[in-house]
């Protein structure tokens, strides 16, 4: 959208200080004006200059379409674009990154052929009775519901959130599951938590808080765990620096007798890397046990993580706790356990292909989390291509999610681990309420 079409949305107000001029373009989403400086005599910066202003035409940058560049200067811009510099720096770093190997966690299976909407809908209609039959034969027992709460998270985190505690409730339950499953740090048992798809590192931060506070409540001093944070993005407002600050603050509040120079800070390592390319063994400290964690690891990223863990140093892998989400964003070719689905099809629908059935599962899985408008009854069909009422679509969506998740659970069970699917939070807290808990057998 051109700048001229949005200028009218800018709230009226006083004139800008000529000595501190800023671009007059108003950013509705950020509720403020653009912070860039325009050229002398201009109201807008180059990025937001209206297209009819007589200035040179601008086009999206091919490297990063979030910004534009004068068309006449495109060639020179590509050589100095920040994205080019970032890519060059990343390539240079990779030459000295033993934990990077392109595609090391990708599956060898060829990619599934793309299906148009008509083909996909036909596959869904064919898969519905197959899914119902599989569920009746294989998944009759419901998942264990274990909505837990961690006292340390409630003590530190909850007072900071007077209203919306949905994320904190999920973190509290996941952290308590780690504790009760024996996937917990202690002064005599140092561990490293590896958070996949970490984002800002929020889950790891509160694991750190809970572990340190628990040790201090027992008389301290605390021995915080180590953390390895993995994400392919580089989000703003990361929590990395907060880990040490939290340890210092908790010591000051609950164990002030420990001198500041004797308060150990956690080792926090962040790597910007796609899980697909991660060689985990090269990131871990020798002799240190590790535990994988993640909250709402999206779609195919869960399958890449499972293969990453299986290919890593299993002798030091104590276990994993992964809250999964977005089965509709999976990939038949990258799914961790296609043999599991193929075996089910061989028993219940030998004439249906794995690829089409999995694509149908992905489509149906979205029905469980799409939600309803207020007041929509269970019997509402709403012109849906399946002809099924919304309550039945939701039920089938949960069955599709269960099948995808059961294959992941079986993947680790086949490696000799104790693996369990469980409901870790209330549905009104999050519709993505299933976690995979993996433990090394005793």
UniProtKB/Swiss-Prot annotation:
Matching entries from Pfam families are given as: TRM13, zf-TRM13_CCCH, zf-U11-48K
Span of the signal peptide: none
Q: Give the residue ranges for region: Disordered.
A: 1-21
Q: Which domain of life is it from?
A: Eukaryota
The places in or outside the cell where this protein is found are:
Cytoplasm; Nucleus, Nucleolus
GO biological process, alphabetically ordered: tRNA methylation; tRNA nucleoside ribose methylation
Reported EC number(s) for this entry are 2.1.1.225
Q: Which reaction does it catalyse?
A: cytidine(4) in tRNA(Pro) + S-adenosyl-L-methionine = 2'-O-methylcytidine(4) in tRNA(Pro) + S-adenosyl-L-homocysteine + H(+); cytidine(4) in tRNA(Gly)(GCC) + S-adenosyl-L-methionine = 2'-O-methylcytidine(4) in tRNA(Gly)(GCC) + S-adenosyl-L-homocysteine + H(+); adenosine(4) in tRNA(His) + S-adenosyl-L-methionine = 2'-O-methyladenosine(4) in tRNA(His) + S-adenosyl-L-homocysteine + H(+)
Q: Name one GO cellular component term.
A: nucleolus
Start and end residues, zinc fingers (CHHC U11-48K-type): 58-85
Give the UniProt keywords, A-Z: Cytoplasm, Metal-binding, Methyltransferase, Nucleus, S-adenosyl-L-methionine, Transferase, tRNA processing, Zinc, Zinc-finger
A GO MF label: tRNA 2'-O-methyltransferase activity
- What residues bind Zn(2+), as annotated? 61, 67, 77, 81
Main location class: cytoplasm
User: What does it do?
Assistant: tRNA methylase which 2'-O-methylates cytidine(4) in tRNA(Pro) and tRNA(Gly)(GCC), and adenosine(4) in tRNA(His).
Q: Which family does the similarity line name?
A: Belongs to the methyltransferase TRM13 family.
State the name under which the record lists this protein: tRNA:m(4)X modification enzyme TRM13
* Originating gene: TRM13
């Amino acid at each position: 959208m051109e700048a001229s079409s949005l200028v009218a949305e800018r709230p009226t107000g006083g004139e800008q200080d000529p000595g501190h001029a800023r671009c007059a373009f108003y950013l509705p989403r950020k509720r403020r004006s653009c912070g860039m400086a325009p050229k002398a005599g201009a109201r807008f910066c180059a990025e937001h200059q209206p297209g009819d202003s007589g200035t040179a035409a601008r086009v999206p940058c091919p490297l990063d379409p979030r910004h534009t560049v004068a068309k006449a200067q495109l060639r020179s811009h590509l050589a100095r674009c920040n994205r080019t510099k970032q890519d060059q720096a990343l390539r240079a770093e990779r030459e000295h990154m033993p934990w990077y190997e392109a595609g090391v966690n990708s599956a060898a299976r060829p990619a599934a052929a793309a299906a148009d909407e008509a083909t996909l809908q036909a596959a869904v209609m064919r898969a519905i009775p197959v899914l119902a039959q599989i569920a009746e034969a294989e998944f009759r027992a419901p998942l264990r519901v274990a909505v837990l709460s961690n006292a340390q998270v409630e003590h530190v985190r909850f007072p900071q959130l007077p209203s919306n505690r949905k994320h904190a409730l999920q973190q509290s339950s996941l952290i308590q599951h780690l504790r009760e499953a024996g996937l917990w740090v202690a002064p005599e048992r140092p561990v490293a938590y590896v958070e996949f798809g970490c984002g800002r590192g929020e889950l790891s931060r509160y694991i750190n808080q809970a572990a340190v506070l628990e040790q201090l409540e027992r008389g301290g001093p605390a021995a915080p765990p180590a953390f390895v944070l993995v994400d392919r993005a580089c989000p703003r407002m990361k929590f990395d620096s907060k880990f040490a600050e939290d340890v210092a603050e908790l010591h000051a509040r609950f164990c002030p007798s420990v001198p500041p120079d004797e308060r150990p800070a956690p080792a926090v390592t962040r790597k910007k890397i796609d899980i697909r390319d991660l060689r985990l063994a090269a990131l871990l400290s020798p002799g240190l046990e590790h535990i994988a964690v993640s909250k709402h690891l999206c779609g195919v990223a869960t399958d890449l993580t499972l293969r990453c863990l299986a290919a890593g140093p299993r002798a030091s892998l104590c276990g994993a706790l992964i809250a999964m989400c977005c089965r509709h964003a999976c990939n038949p070719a990258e799914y961790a356990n296609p043999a599991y689905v193929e075996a089910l099809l061989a028993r219940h629908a030998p004439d249906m292909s794995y690829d089409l059935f999995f694509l149908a599962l992905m489509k149906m899985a979205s029905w469980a989390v799409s939600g309803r408008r207020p007041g929509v009854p269970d019997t509402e069909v709403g012109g849906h291509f399946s002809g099924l009422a919304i309550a039945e679509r939701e039920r089938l969506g949960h069955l599709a999610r269960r099948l995808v998740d059961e294959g992941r659970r079986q993947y680790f069970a086949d490696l000799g681990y104790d693996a369990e699917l469980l409901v870790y939070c209330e549905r009104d807290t999050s519709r993505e309420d299933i976690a995979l808990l993996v433990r090394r057998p005793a």
